[in-house]
Design a protein with these regions (language model features):
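Acidic/polar low-complexity segments and flexible, solvent-exposed patches
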Residues: 1-137
C-alpha cells in the first residue's frame, strides 16, 4: 500500500512540475475579424498588407498585431482605428521559445517607436515572423 501511495504522489508531483515548466507564454493578438469564407475575408481586408490569417474551425481569423505588451498593441490598434476598423484583443498561448525571444526584442523596439512608419515596419516583421517560425508557412 505504501508503494502505491508513494507512486501516486510522485506522479502527481511530476504532473504539477511538468505543467509549471511549460514554455508557453501569453501573447496578445490584435484581431480584426473572423470570416466564414475566404472570399469575404479577402474582400474586407484587401487593402491591409500587414495581416496574419489563421484558418481554424472553418473560419478565417485575421490578426493585424501581436505583442506581449498591451500598450504596444494600442499603438498598432490606433493605426487601424483611424481607418475605421474595430479591433479586439485576443490572448493566445505561444510555446515557440525562439519566437517568444524575438517578440520580446521587437516589443522593446515597438515601445520606442514614435512614427506610424516605424510602428508599421516593426509590426510587419512581427507578423511575418509568426507565420514563418510558429505556423511554418
Amino acid at each position: 500500500m505504501g508503494v502505491f501511495s508513494g507512486k501516486f504522489i510522485y506522479d502527481k508531483i511530476n504532473d504539477v512540475y511538468a505543467f509549471s515548466t511549460k514554455n508557453e507564454q501569453i501573447a496578445y493578438f490584435l484581431q480584426l475579424g473572423i470570416y466564414s469564407s475566404e472570399e469575404s475575408m479577402n474582400s474586407d481586408t484587401n487593402s491591409i498588407t500587414n495581416k496574419l490569417v489563421i484558418k481554424k474551425n472553418n473560419n478565417y481569423y485575421v490578426y493585424v498585431g501581436i505583442s506581449m505588451n498591451k500598450d504596444n498593441l494600442k499603438k498598432v490598434c490606433s493605426l487601424y482605428q483611424k481607418l475605421g476598423y474595430n479591433l479586439y484583443f485576443d490572448e493566445v498561448y505561444i510555446d515557440n521559445k525562439e519566437y517568444l525571444y524575438n517578440l520580446e526584442q521587437f516589443d522593446l523596439l515597438l515601445a520606442k517607436a514614435k512614427s506610424n512608419d516605424e510602428i508599421e515596419s516593426i509590426n510587419s516583421v512581427i507578423l511575418s515572423s509568426y507565420e514563418e517560425m510558429v505556423l511554418n508557412k
